[in-house]
Structure formats: C-alpha cells, structure tokens
C-alpha cells in the first residue's frame, strides 16, 4: 500500500522505548486506505514529535493561541493541489508539516484511558487528513466527514473509536 513518505524528527522527551517511526508509518498507511489522495509515495510529510514548549511557541506564533495543543498541521498545498500532486508520478511533493506535543498527548491519553501510542496514532491520522485538505473547523458536515475517516483508519489498526461517548 502506498502512503506518504514520512520524515521524522523525534525530541528525546518522547523516549526511545517505542518505535514512533513505525507507529507514524502504520498511521499513514491506514489514512491512505480511507483517503485515497494520501495513497501515494510521491507525497512527503515532515512529522515532528516535540515537547510542549515548542508546540506552544508555534501555536502562539501561527494560530495566536497562547498554549500548547495536541497536534499542529501546516499544509503546503491546497486541497486541489493535493489531488493534483497525488496523480503526479514525478518527484515527491511536500504535503506539509505536522507537530505533536508530548505532554499534551500524554495527558489526553490518560484522560481518555488509552495508551500514548494509541492517542499519538490518532493524532497522526488526524494531522494527515488536515494536510490533505480536510478541516473539521469549517462546519459540522466537514467535522463529521473528517471524524468518520479517522474512525475508519483507526479501525483498520484495531483502535477503538476515539469519539465514542462512554456512559
């Protein structure tokens, strides 16, 4: 299965006991199965596993939000350009950058009762969909479409629905 090429940069705070590159690669493969525009090895994604301070600074600079967030995505292409790049057999095109915050990811995983690996997998899928042009902040229909793609990708990896409400 083709998927975007991932270039990883992992801050030591994430540790080396877990194969984060493998987790991100499997997430990319699953995302490519549910969003065919990602099913191409001619798309390049930079994935940075950072600490909260780095994500906080980026979130403040680029989104005017003075706090860290779980994942930031910086697309390099419009939705139309993504679809065109996916059809191009030329050299890899830069889809964009994605940055995950370790502390936020760890806290959210604990709140959700899932492993950090599971939550990080979800965030990589979420970030890839943003880079492909999906945006849950555009409206309810867009949010539902994106969440459904996330659910499908995660289900392919045996990961439960992250949006399911527990009674």
Swiss-Prot record:
MF-aspect GO terms: metalloendopeptidase activity; RNA endonuclease activity; zinc ion binding
Keyword Metal-binding: yes
Name of the protein described by the UniProt record: Endoribonuclease YbeY
Major subcellular site: cytoplasm
Manner of cofactor binding, per the entry note: Binds 1 zinc ion.
Keywords from the named record: Cytoplasm, Endonuclease, Hydrolase, Metal-binding, Nuclease, Ribosome biogenesis, rRNA processing, Zinc
One Pfam assignment: YbeY
An annotated GO cellular component: cytoplasm
Gene (name only): ybeY
Subcellular location: Cytoplasm
Family: Belongs to the endoribonuclease YbeY family.
InterPro entries: MetalPrtase_cat_dom_sf_prd, YbeY, YbeY_CS
């Amino acid at each position: 299965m083709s998927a975007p090429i991932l270039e990883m940069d992992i801050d030591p705070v994430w540790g080396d006991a877990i194969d984060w590159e493998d987790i991100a690669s499997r997430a990319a493969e699953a995302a490519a199965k549910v969003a065919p525009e990602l099913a191409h090895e001619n798309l390049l994604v930079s994935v940075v596993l950072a600490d909260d301070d780095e994500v906080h600074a980026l979130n403040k600079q680029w989104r005017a939000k003075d706090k860290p967030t779980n994942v930031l995505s910086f697309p390099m292409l419009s939705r139309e350009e993504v679809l065109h790049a996916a059809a191009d057999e030329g050299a890899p095109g830069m889809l964009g950058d994605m940055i995950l915050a370790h502390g936020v990811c760890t806290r959210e995983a604990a709140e959700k009762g899932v492993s950090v690996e599971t939550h990080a997998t979800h965030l990589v899928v979420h970030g890839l969909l943003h880079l492909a042009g999906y945006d849950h902040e555009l409206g309810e229909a867009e949010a539902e479409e994106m969440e459904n793609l996330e659910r499908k990708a995660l289900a392919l990896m045996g990961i439960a629905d992250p949006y399911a409400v527990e009674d």
